[in-house]
Amino acid sequence: MNIDALFGNKERITLGFFGGSITEGAGASENQFCYCQRVTQLLQQRYPETVFETVNASIGGTGSSLGAFRLKEDLLVHQPDFVFVEYAVNDFDTEKELCQRSMEGIVRQILNYRASCPIVFIYTLSDEMAKKYYDKGLIPQSIQYHQEVADYYHIPSINAGKPLYDTYTSQQLSVTEFLPDRVHPNDRGHEHYAQSILQVLPSMSFEIKYPKSPMQNNCLETGVMVPAKNYLASGWEYHPQSMFGRYPEYISSSQPGAKLTVPFHGSIIGIYHTIQKDSGMFSYSIDGKESTIFNSWDQYALQFDRACYFIPASDLDEDADHVLTIEVLEQKDEQSTGNMIRIGAFLMLE
């Protein structure tokens, strides 16, 4: 089945886009010029009798290991008919097992939602990927990891980054002509991505397979976000306000010694939190073992506030129950204006 069969006789199609900041539209002068909107516009031109809608559930600065936990709430609730997944740039430094567990978790959740839902993996570009791999005639490692998952499920993929690399290198242009900060495309870069996608998409065949057995036995197929308010304890305050539009609520504490106890089952636990000018540090331990300090402030907090995530552990006994303990610390980064900890949800397996 090709896109003519998928889109040609439909009254309405909802396209889902799921990825990081590139897919969210970072770098575009206006939303209409980001590659997702341009792909939608080009498909609308190709199929004028079909109404195309776009649901862009991408979040900048996040990889597939958060995506596997937020997919249901952020994208699948909108009932997409077709899903593009783009995480190769943000998964660039993610180790293979977690990367593939996450991407496979995303795939299986989509297929659990609708077994016939077409999926396409999109591979974009950063200058770091280009220098470490394409300059040497190699395929970026994260793309290799993603492609193994794609091959297992017969999911088609489009490398939109390599044609962009070929364009600026063959014309002896600087990468900044398309990626001004060497990661996020300007309008010209977004348009290049969109044209590359539409050049390949019509020739693709969608015959996705759904094996009963996952490629990774511990893939994140059952990943969910559990509200942090469920674990509210002394010294913490509940806020029904949105966490920068990324989560509908959060809890906070700046009280040194304030603790949270979070029981969970399975191999992985994550924390969906914020990074702000007044963010502090907390210690965490799992199953009463030695605690580790985590700094929820970074240098980008001086420029903007944002939602982020942290995975304290991903290789625990998958058949066992565990307990995560968090404690707010008095110490903080010297550039932070406070020691506030804000948490929207915990990432765990059902």
Predicted regions and their residues:
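Serine-esterase "nucleophile elbow" of acetyl-processing enzymes
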Residues: 1-58, 70-79, 261, 265, ...
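Charged helix-capping and loop-helix junction motifs
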Residues: 98-105, 139-143
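A short helix->loop->beta-strand "cap" motif at the edges of active sites that frequently abuts
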Residues: 113-119
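Conserved catalytic region of serine esterases and O-acyltransferases that act on ester linkages
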Residues: 191-350
